[in-house]
Amino acid sequence: MTDIDRRTLSADEWDELHFPRPEVQDFDRVVDAALSRRGFLRGVLVFGSGAAVMGTTALVSPQTAQAQQTSRFAFTPIAAQTDGTVHVPEGYTWQRLISWGDPLFPGVAEFDDAQAGALADSDKVFGENTDGMELFVIGGAQVIAVNHEYTNNDVNLVNHVDAKPVDAEGVRKLQNLQGVTVMEVREGANGWEVVKDSRFNRRIDHNTPMRLSGPAAGHDLLKTEADPTGTAALGTLNNCGSGKTPWGTYLTCEENFNGYFGTTSALPEDAVIAAGYKRYGINEKGFDYDYHVFDARFDVAKTPHEPHRHGYIVEIDPADPTSTPVKRTALGRIKHENAAAIVAPDGRVVVYMGDDERGEFLYRWVSRDKYVPGGDTSTLLEEGVLSVAKFNDDMTGTWVALTPDATGMTAAEIAIFTRTAASKVGATTMDRPEWVAVNPVSVEAYCCLTNNSRRGVLTDAGTVRTNAGGDPMTVNAVNPREANNYGQIVRWRPEGDDHASDAFAWDLYVMAGNPTVAQGAMAGSANINAGNLFNSPDGMMIDSTGIIWIQTDGEDSNEGEFAGMGNNQMLAGDPVTGEIQRFLTGPFGAEVTGLTWSADRRTMFVGIQHPAAPFPDGEGKRPRSSIVAIKRADNALVG
């Protein structure tokens, strides 16, 4: 993988570049009938108090709504930027909290830029490419758990060939720098810092012992020579977004786990394994990490079941650094983006999840048992019903349960081959479902659909492109644009204000676009204007007041159809009026991803991943993914 590949391409785009499928791009067949009849381009769709939950949703122009109500945001929006640093509004400041390679424990050396950090310390420092994060208050201490999604091998390996490790030591360093960091932070006279001698500090990486739980645990397809029980895995891979349970545990989400596997031999010929490999994108080459060359666990010819042990949501107790993380197979095996958990009115736990790949699906899991504050929660995520979303053109939808009766698969098979189960029940293909967020002040949820350049595009044979399971990615109401390079955010309200209900109404909160260079569908929805242009919404959190914080991971060329968008950014959205304003811009080449708040909400922590600019140390230094802490100058609440 080249430096340009690593920094500018998503996992889907990398697959498309290196494992191309024939296609013809037909940009003239943009289906705007679905747009015009629903008013997506006339006004943002708002759930009004008078809208029937399963009936027609009210159409409210953002200009009209904003005329009735002044902006709720306590900041002046900033302009798009193209430089190599972070920008925030006037009256706000930012500081670096921690960067890749910074020590987490006493006695660990400071980052050595010339050596890209020492191998011996790579399991004792802050990992690379920060992503989802959550803050926990534990006995008065503020503890952040944060993901490290992947590595830029050309940056963190001194010895490499074409960004590939050349020996087992290099592979081990890469494995150490990924996973999860748990760290205590505190605010002092000089701002925020990591408490290096905290008992909570911990690194979890690609070799940390894990326990497998739920319906897939112990299944033959999870058994290996090293683990004949199929219940004890090593490591958590490609940790993308995050979640937080009501009982105070951290949920880290395994996304593009397929990229770590490969072989110099032939792929397994077993029909079940081969079909699963194809559905999840496991091939001989992987993403050029070359783990399989130096670590037999990742060689699928030698350990063909190992990929089945990854692709899950992992539960971690941040209060106990000696606890064993648990892979919760009941929540399905997909390319998990994040996990948004909420308690239903009857006490059952609901978890929403997106599968981040073109044409994949949106999921919901509802626990069998009820959450009782102070009760035993150790098995709450082991038994429940996993469902997948069907979006109808009349702006209603249904969660379809993935049961043995509905799919013809066993419970264990559903947990291991979740995508196959979802295809069997006719789930709606989506434009790469990313983060899901649940509004804490209104019974509704949102999902970022980041982009899909293959939506509605034809192959050489004249058929519509499909996902890896053969499901056609035709234009549909919730994904209404062909060759969608901008993305959109879908919102739904469950029937009866109950997230455990199987029925919901939906609309599109925003369709990103560029009205300065495009017309029609590609101009975006009415709440997009020259002052808030963005593409590829990815990360998303909703704060305690209901403000939607949208983070992007898209094209930052600032040219052509992306002119005026600048670097990746974070925007604030009002769910009532549809107003969206730009709050932060990241350095060139970086994704803005991961967000949490201090206990008093006077500090916002934001992740800056894979900067191409020499951020944050300046010219001549290696770019380092970092967490920045943002405050208001008057120390009031952020936002």
Language model features: what each stretch is:
Residues 23-35, 55-90:
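C-terminal segment of N-terminal export signals and the immediately downstream linker at the start
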